[in-house]
Each structure stands twice: as C-alpha cells, then as structure tokens.
Amino acid sequence: MAKKVVTDLDLKDKKVLVRVDFNVPMKDGKITNDNRIVAALPTIEYILEQNGKAILFSHLGKVKTEEDKEGKSLRPVAVRLSELLGKEVKFVPTTRGPELEKAIDELKDGEVLLFENTRFEDIDGKKESKNDPELGKYWASLGDVFVNDAFGTAHRAHASNVGIASNLESAAGFLMEKEIKFIGGVVDNPARPLVAILGGAKVSDKIGVIENLLTKADKVLVGGGMTFTFMAAQGQEIGKSLLEADKVELAKGLLEKAGDKLVLPVDAVVSKEFSNDAPFHTVSADSIPADEMGLDIGQATIDLFTKELQGAKTVVWNGPMGVFELSNFAKGTIGVCEAIANLTDATTIIGGGDSAAAAMDLGFADKFTHISTGGGASLEYLEGKELPGVASISDK
C-alpha cells in the first residue's frame, strides 16, 4: 500500500488528530454494540505508547436539526472507550471554539480526548458532510498530524476526513490499513480461485459490484432478493417474489456477459406471507407458485454454493441469502456462513453490513480472515471506485 501508515509518523509530543468510526448503534442512550470502538483500540493504544496526544472525533448517525442532536452525543462512547482503555477519556461536548481549543492545549502526552459528533456541524449548511473547506482547515489547525482510521466513511468526502487531510500530513490507522489490504486485495491482486458471494434485496444496490467482480472473480454466486430479477430475466416464473422490473434487461445483459461464471439458486424457500408465522416450503427455482414469494435459498442451493466454494483461495461475501431477520428464512445465510467459515486455506472476507452481523450473531466472527467495518465503503471499493477517504491520505 503506497499510503502512509500511523507507524510512518513521529508521534512523540505531537497532537494527533484521529478520525475514528464510532458510529455505534444506540438505544435509550446506551451502546448496544461496541465493535467499532473495539476496532479502533490498536491505533489509539499505539499513539499513546508513542507518547502522542490522541484527539479523537467521529460522526454518530445523521444530524440535520437541533432536535436530531438528542441521543446523538458521543458522551456514552467516551465512557465506554474509557472502560476499554482503562484510562480517562476527556470528553468535550462541542465541535469547535475556545472550550475545545483549551482542552487540546492542556492535553499531556499519553492522554486521550474525544470531542462531540462531527455531524453537529451539519445543522448549519451541512459543513461536515459537504466538506466545507473552512471547517476542514479549522480542525486541521487543532493538531500536528492526522490519522484516518474510519474506513466506514472512506467513500465520503467529508470535512473530518478529506478536509483535514488536505491541510495536514496524514496517515492510515491500523484498521484502515487492514481494510485496504484485504478489500483492496480482492480487487487488485487476489489469490485464485476468487469466489464472490453476493446477496441482499436489490440488484440496483449491487450492479456495480456484480459488473466489476464478473471481471475479477472466477465465480460469482448470487442469493437474496435480487436473484428473482435474474430469474425473471431468464423467463422464469417468480410468483410474488421481489422484482425490480426496470432492471430485468440489465440482469439479462449481465447473464449473457457472465456465462457460467454467475451461479444462481436452484431452489427457494417460499411462503404466501412475509412473516415468520406463515407456513413455508421449498420448491425448485423454476416452479415458484404464482401466489407465493421466495424468501430464502433452499438446501439444494446451500449444497451447490458449498460445492462452488471448495478449493477457493479467496472468498468475499456481501449480503444475506434470504430474509435473515426472520428465523424461518435465515437458514440459507447460516448455511453459506458455515460453508465459508469451514474453508481452511482460503482468505475469507465479509464486506460489512448484514453479512458481518450474521457472522457475529452466529459466533463465526473468528473463523473469517477479515470482517469489514464499512458496508457502503466496502461495496464501493469492490466496485473498483476510488475512495476519497483513502485517496486523501498522504503518499509514502
């Protein structure tokens, strides 16, 4: 990777600005999953070991009005981070001004400060999300060097990543470095055979990824709601299954281009209702009843996909195989997750989002080589797009 990493910087006595991804799920003011905070620890701890002063900031949710601020403060994150680090994390409840500047000036080597949600700046003209140059310059003025460890927002050009990096020497944190290595590796130089498994509801969300991976992968296995648009493109009856009618022609084109590289399900678990209480059964993919909808892949498809995965050296998975949140239609996702987890000599990567949640829920997280922390960023990377948050980091 030709970008500077945090280990390339001299951090002793330095004020180190760190863009982390602390966009954690919250309920009633409490953090329900702290994975993203845990993922940032190696970078923060390294800065402290090097006697730097860690000045952390992140967004949390979307903030458009004063009312939106309710429940979007990073204060609970500071408390949790303090517990994880085993040391005080000074929280500053503002994003600019004398209080923040004074707190940073008083910071000693090896100390940590977290300031308020960067998107509080969006209330007045979307300064953070639109990468307001003055805001980027101001935040850059608060530190000596900048470390970007927020891969989750790398596909966005915001003041808190690109804006600061255009004004200050910058480097990738350890998490960002890992994401670039694994997700970038799939696109740029994978060990072969490379098998991609793509799920999720909509073809429209994954068109770019499918198109790019058809040029890179040896096989692309497709599951989830988007399979029915491909089936319709082949002239199959799909009953009441999810269909993006305006994408059928596009799906047809992808099928023609892909040949036998694209593998579709051979059966489906169907039901008359989108409900866990309704009766369900498995049918062949080409005989879905007119009054039923496909909500998961069946056992024959799980077996087929498991077979296609054998011998793979690199596997990337993004998106569930069915309606994972309803237990009757989660078996396909579980089956695929198990099949990937059982591969012994492959680099296995989950591209964030629902698939990452599925692997963690099932207790398989440690069986994968890498689970990405950025859903949208991973997808854009897999599409072959340049990510502004990565591109703006200083070159070595």
UniProtKB/Swiss-Prot annotation:
Gene3D superfamilies: Phosphoglycerate kinase, N-terminal domain. It comes from Listeria monocytogenes serovar 1/2a (strain ATCC BAA-679 / EGD-e). Monomer. Belongs to the phosphoglycerate kinase family. Keywords: ATP-binding, Cytoplasm, Glycolysis, Kinase, Nucleotide-binding, Transferase. One of its GO terms (molecular function) is ATP binding. It comes from the Bacteria. It holds the Pfam family PGK. ATP binds at K206, G294, E325, G352, G353, D354, S355. It catalyses: (2R)-3-phosphoglycerate + ATP = (2R)-3-phospho-glyceroyl phosphate + ADP. This is Phosphoglycerate kinase. Substrate binds at D21, F22, N23, R36, H59, L60, G61, K62, R119, R156.
